[in-house]
Amino acid sequence: MTKHESKRNSGTDVSRREFLRLAAMGAMAGAAAALPEGVARAAEERPGSAYASHLRGVAEATDCKIEIEPPKEKIRYDILDAHLHFVDFLEQSDGFPALCAAMDLAGVSKAVIFGMGIAKQWDGSMDEPPTYYLSNDSRCYYYSATDFLVAEELLAQPTEIRERFYPFCCGFNANDRFAADHVEQVLRLYPKFWNGIGEIMSRHDDLTALTYGEPPHIDGPGFLGIFDLAAAKGLPVLVHHNVTAQNTERVLYLEELKRALAYNRNCNIIWAHIGISRRVEIKGLTKIADELLRGNKNLWVDISWLVYDYYFLDQFPNNYFDGDSLDDWAALIERHPDRFMIGTDKVGHWKTYPAEAVKYYTLLDKLRPATVDLICRENALSLIKQY
């Protein structure tokens, strides 16, 4: 800035930096006025936190026009996305305004949103940064700031964006017996804000193998403390727990899930992806899911990520066949219509978001209209904490 420009800006004109600061304060006050009392107080106590950067982010999202591919299907269903990460494994995101644009294109009116509780490390020996947890063999680590990124960014949004999301907290190590204490602190910092807990990682093949510390398992004492807290607070818990290891058809980890479900029947657990991940290939998954749902009234499942492409549509990359067809899955859902939900499992970037949402139309077209309403919206709404 030249001396002349500095002198000019010191007069009646307002500099761009000062304008952003003042605009952020005004946005904060307006946003806080529409929030529940506890959350409004939390917002008011954070002058200049994420609000100024949010205003810049909105402008950037508009100016650079983040590419979002429109769906190839005509929108026919109103969906609540039950599984959506606001950030990727580098804790980066295209932001809420672009996400809402993608949701609008896909016919998704609301979403359960959470961060990424595990971050990918960029090792000093690597010239190129990773872009995904499988980019290289660098380690991953638990990242507690992810909850604050989600909370601050969401609180910074105008009401019409904020009211579309149900935030879950996930930034803790569930192996730690202090995990429930950490979650309680986050709940206290953002009162009447969090609608659930998750996605928590347990038995996530390469991801948990790359993460510092012992491999997490859903029936460990840290998890059990989370379940007790969730039951007391009325919060559902979303857990990724593989049904078995990679490259074996033996079901190795099912008993851990059963013990977790039996531990506290007042804790409602959502089983992410029906226990499936990359290279997890088993026979009879519909039978396993059916038996679990019959025996555990506190279990729900989300259909998201690879389980739909591989197991519902038989699109395994190696032509593996698990023995079940799309009709078998539709029949299972009709037997338990109040226990399923669908999600995109997108991670921070929204270019292909519409395609991930409308891909479920092939399944939805096979279901009764009442069942469609349940798995597209009502089941998730019945679970999440309402204030």
Explain the meaning of each model-derived region.
Residues 48-60, 65-76, 125-245:
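Active-site gating/metal-coordination segments in enzymes
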Residues 87-95, 119-122, 140-146, 172-180, ...:
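Acidic-and-aromatic substrate-binding clefts and catalytic sites of carbohydrate-active enzymes
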Residues 35-45:
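Signal peptide processing junction and immediate N-terminal pro/mature segment
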Residues 45-49, 55-58, 158, 204, ...:
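Catalytic pocket-lining loop regions of alpha/beta-barrel enzymes
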Residues 80-84, 111-113, 167-169, 197-198, ...:
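Hydrophobic faces of well-ordered beta-strands that scaffold small-molecule active sites
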Residues 64-67, 96-99, 148-153, 179-184, ...:
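Alpha-helical scaffolding within the catalytic cores
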Residues 88-129:
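N-terminal carbohydrate-binding/catalytic regions of secreted carbohydrate-active enzymes
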Residues 2-4, 15, 19-30, 45-82, ...:
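Mid-to-C-terminal alpha-helical segments outside catalytic/metal-binding sites
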